[in-house]
From Swiss-Prot:
Residues of the LIM zinc-binding domain: 21-83, 85-147
A single GO molecular function term of this UniProt record: transcription coactivator activity
Keyword Metal-binding: yes
Domain of life: Eukaryota
Cellular compartments annotated: Nucleus
Protein name (Swiss-Prot/TrEMBL): Rhombotin-1
Function: May be involved in gene regulation within neural lineage cells potentially by direct DNA binding or by binding to other transcription factors.
A GO CC term attached to the entry: nucleus
GO biological process assignments: positive regulation of transcription by RNA polymerase II
Length: 155
């Protein structure tokens, strides 16, 4: 997926007295001590919003996406311009805005990212093995190795 632009919302320092900027959202002068800048325009904190859902994007640390001169939140950007795919475990569609897990070229719903033999869900830091597009926990992988069922590489 290619973004036109993804940017953090910079909170600019105190603006110089006598040189107040105009807000691109409401066209009023920004009299606040701080102002925001996005798409090379200045905004009140309350005026910088997603063009689709009107959620506020002016909070410190928030990220906004721009495409075709629209300012969007992550969810709406992915809904409008993101790509969807199918889960490698259940084959159901994964919406573009949904969080996923990846193992090589495979993409999984978070709930589907589990050993496909014993259904043990993986936690951060757990070892897992990928064999014939199946995700295996360490115990099932080692059991398969002892039985001579398969060989694969550690992920």
């Amino acid at each position: 997926m290619v973004l036109d632009k993804e940017e953090g919302v910079p909170m600019l320092s105190v603006q110089p007295k006598g040189k107040q900027k105009g807000c691109a959202g409401c066209n009023r002068k920004i009299k606040d001590r701080y102002l925001l800048k996005a798409l090379d325009k200045y905004w009140h904190e309350d005026c910088l919003k997603c063009a689709c859902c009107d959620c506020r994007l002016g909070e410190v640390g928030s990220t906004l996406y721009t495409k075709a001169n629209l300012i969007l939140c992550r969810r709406d950007y992915l809904r409008l311009f993101g790509t969807t795919g199918n889960c490698a475990a259940c084959s159901k569609l994964i919406p573009a805005f949904e969080m996923v897990m990846r193992a090589r070229d495979n993409v999984y719903h978070l709930d589907c990212f589990a050993c496909q033999l014993c259904n043990q869900r993986f936690c951060v830091g757990d070892k897992f093995f990928l064999k014939n597009n199946m995700i295996l926990c360490q115990m099932d992988y080692e059991e398969g190795q002892l039985n001579g069922s398969f060989e694969t590489q550690v992920q």
